[in-house]
Amino acid sequence: MVHSKKDKSVMKHSDIKKRGAAVLEEEDVLQQDEQLLVDGATIDCDSDDDEEFQSAEEEVLSSGSESSSKEGSTPGSPVEGSDEEAEDEDADEEEDEDAEFNRLLAAEEGDSEGEYGSEDFSDDNDTRPLREKLSSMQLKMIPDGESASVKTRYSDGTPRIIKPEITPVYDSDDTDVETANTIGNIPLSAYDEMPHIGYDINGKRIMRPAKGSALDALLDTIELPEGWTGLLDQNTGSSLNLTPEELDLISKIQKNEQVDDSVDPYEPYVDWFTRHEEIMPVTAIPEPKRRFVPSKHEAKRIMKIVKAIREGRIIPPNKLRELREQEQANNFSYDLWGDSEETNEHIMNLRAPKLPPPTNEESYNPPEEYLLTPEERAEWEKMDPSDRKRNFLPQKYGSLRKVPGYGESVRERFERSLDLYLAPRVRKNKLNIDPESLIPELPSPKDLRPFPIRCSTVYAGHKGKIRTLSIDPSGLWLATGSDDGTVRVWEILTGREVYKATIVDIKNNQDDHIETVEWNPDKTVGLLAVAAGENIYLLVPPIFGFEVENNSRLKIENGYGFDTFGNVKKSALNVNSDDEQAETEATVKKQVAQWNKPTQKQAENDVAIVITCRKTVKKISWHRKGDYFVSVQPESGHTSVLIHQLSKHLTQSPFNKSKGIIMDAKFHPFKPQLFVCSQRYIRIYDLSQQVLVKKLLPGARWLSTIDIHPRGDNLIASSFDKRVLWHDLDLAATPYKTLRYHEKAVRSVGFHKKLPLFCSAADDGTIHVFHGTVYDDMMKNPLLVPLKKLTGHKLVNSLGVLDTVWHPREAWLFSAGADNTARLWTT
């Protein structure tokens, strides 16, 4: 059967409609979540094998070719023909189809919008619904995970894979994502009269969505759907609704919540800066403080500018002209005889001190009282130039023209130049402090009585200066030792001399002097230790009665049973040993002192025993029990300190090495300790453990004597550099107080045994009496109060008071001076 061209065109038109309906149905199906293939073939969505897809494609292509061949021919039409005729016929058909398609499009574009209906886009031959059409087909869903493998056909029939849509997330970059409507930069008004509004990425038309009625718009505003904005999307023509993600984002912003779910607002806090010391530095260094405070360098620059403006070094432009005019005016009126203008000196500039103005004694015609007598002139000339109060002698001239030139002007200028060059200048700021506030509040001396205030008795009789004195334990007898070689005993109340013994014959021996005398503290004996030269004499003065004198001599004689009389025992010597060192080990240490019986002449002077040492003995101090006494020989090296035992006639040296020049040594009042005073240090030794307990640092250049408080926790020391040092043994090794009241070397210091008094005597001829209270409370410091300054001894050869001693019970003080007298000071 042969069809005409008109029939063919009608058939082609119907085919176009069928294809359009199929395209619409295919779009509806593809918009669903599950994508389907409905070309008559069955595709297994669960299979991932490429061979299955290839076979499915071949079936689809074969079925399409069969259907097209069936549609293109009738049962009665001939199939045979030449290839050329077939090709010509196909070409004609294609041209006819294109022409018909263009005509239909032109007709559609020319029609109005209201002429389109559903029947124009429906299939006339088959009016069944899509569900019935698909009922006879086998369909399988393709999961979303395999949506990338869904394949369709292009317009020429070749297969194409439809890739899944890109779902942008927060971290993705969607700046290059193409929109659904790909018309480009063309105004949408060009599609106002068309059923579609553009084309998608696949080149298919995007049909204009149907518009609702006014009632629907009103209902939409009343019952707002989720994501409703009331706006119209110009690209799609539909209402612009917000997605759930956008609604969630807006809700979080309104609630001030975290927008990004990947950020944890409650993550654990990392303490970068802790109290624990880290090895490696932390990179998160905090901002330095200088970022938040004003800059010091800028402040300095600003102050420099301000100072320059104040000083006139920076002049504003408006004042510069005035200054120039004023300067020109001043140049015409210059005061030749005017004073020079003073310039502002630098802050670090220190002017040289001005010379003192001349006084009346420097006048060429001074008053008569300023002129020196011949005796004063001779005394001035004998003095050293450094000791003179003035470096010139006042002279009187009749007139000014008779005054000669000053011969010392060059020397004075030179000395002033040296002073300015060598002496540093210091600016001292005066402090406005009330001097009375610096004086500590001390109790009145009237409230601290009794203490010695006057001289009651003078013990005169010695022909040389009295170097030492001592009071016996009973407090009735005073012993003195003088450079005349005699020891005298005085009755303290009457000042009567009751005993005299010549120890040193000054005619034959002028080198030895009586250095010290000390009574034995035991009241049952009457022993007097006298140190003269290298010997120590123990005397028993016949003033105490038979019983006391007998006990004294008996105590000395009992020691002869332990005396070796110079025969020293040697250590055991091994005769079978050939070692040369054995003989050295068997040798005995040299004897440090000898206990000898007195000669007949010495016995007549009541000398009981004589102890001979190596060097001159300067100090003697008894132990409180009266059996031991210590002697000091400054020139004897490591044997400077010797401890003598009266009951055994034994002498031993406690030290093996010399600790400097020893000046004094005394026992602790009740502990087995020995205080050793050298020139600069005071050391305290424990005799029982034979260890050094403490070392005191007085800070003096040359110590002279020491004395220990009866409680044993405080000590005073005197020095030749005019200082008295109080040491608290419970505190530091440095002095608690330093007293500087004397003008010359301090010779003696001493504590009272019962009362809170102590004194110091010096070569200036004065004795200072102090009140010293030591509290039982360890938290309170000792109270030191100056009480009285006693004067009465005369100076002889720059020597004043040489020794002092307190009465055992009363507040009386005995002193020995270089004026050959001893004095008793009472209350």
Curated annotation (Swiss-Prot):
Residues 7-18 have a biased composition (Basic and acidic residues). Component of the NOP7 complex, composed of ERB1, NOP7 and YTM1. The complex is held together by ERB1, which interacts with NOP7 via its N-terminal domain and with YTM1 via a high-affinity interaction between the seven-bladed beta-propeller domains of the 2 proteins. The NOP7 complex associates with the 66S pre-ribosome. It comes from the Eukaryota. The lineage of its organism: Eukaryota, Fungi, Dikarya, Ascomycota, Saccharomycotina. It comes from Eremothecium gossypii (strain ATCC 10895 / CBS 109.51 / FGSC 9923 / NRRL Y-1056) (Yeast). Belongs to the WD repeat BOP1/ERB1 family. Residues 291-409 are annotated as: Required for interaction with NOP7. The gene is ERB1. One of its GO terms (molecular function) is large ribosomal subunit rRNA binding. The keyword Calcium does not apply. This is Ribosome biogenesis protein ERB1. Residues 45-60, 81-99, 108-124 have a biased composition (Acidic residues).
